[in-house]
């Protein structure tokens, strides 16, 4: 029975992962008016963009689409960058995370679709399609690292993030460091192509098997700050989080179990309570804030290892946005 239950759980996690990779966001991208021959009369570029993808992958087709409108005809695709309401967007963060951070409507805790392009609710009507601006000049050097024509800056940033996740999962980055050059390039290409089977073939080399727990969980929490806070617009919280934690016991029980302490599964609620107790005073119920991943509110009872196995972005990280309630 235990084997059957484990197989059912694996099938469920695989189904969730497929839904995550199928998730898309409708984007409406406009050329910066200061770079357009027709100011604000240029037609926008519309696309259903995979949530797990990265904005720079759109630059070649955007450069071609807006070529006849550009004041500067010699600009190159890798010189492009994106902004939302005047804020430069970090190109190393996945599209879905950027949307959840800057524009995501209040998510429903039940019945939320990962693919927001299908029948968006009225709460999403004001934020979808997500309206972005693309620029091919005036790179914001103080906020963004420049890209290169060969795409190696983007590739290296992705692989470095994969290395960090690999180290946390296994206690060593040996897996990614010994990955062949072909598989390393293939992992990044699979994310660019949104090719889940090819991605799984390579990523499964790095993941501990289902019956072997992670050493620590690669998960980051993003807390948007108000513009007048005097701090960067985003605060990232990260700490080593094991997949299991000691069970709270009384003194006598603790003495009896000293040599073999009982453990329980680390849930998202227990992790948030330990890292952000002021925002999450309860381990079980969101009171002041809610965790959002891939556009959906995540149950506090979700085991964080299962969450990462099924819902991580292509670099192996679960990026969770903390959204205030009320």
From Swiss-Prot:
One Pfam family here: ATG5_HBR
Location in the cell: Preautophagosomal structure membrane
Signal peptide boundaries: none
Crosslinked residue numbers (Glycyl lysine isopeptide (Lys-Gly) (interchain with G-Cter in atg12)): 163
GO biological process, one term: protein transport
Post-translational modification: Conjugated to atg12; which is essential for autophagy.
MF term (GO), any: Atg8-family ligase activity
UniProt keyword annotations, A-Z: Autophagy, Isopeptide bond, Membrane, Protein transport, Transport, Ubl conjugation
Topology class, membrane: Peripheral membrane protein
Assembly with partners or alone: Conjugated with atg12.
PANTHER family: AUTOPHAGY PROTEIN 5
Its biological purpose: Involved in cytoplasm to vacuole transport (Cvt) and autophagic vesicle formation. Autophagy is essential for maintenance of amino acid levels and protein synthesis under nitrogen starvation. Required for selective autophagic degradation of the nucleus (nucleophagy). Also required for mitophagy, which eliminates defective or superfluous mitochondria in order to fulfill cellular energy requirements and prevent excess ROS production.
Record's protein name: Autophagy protein 5
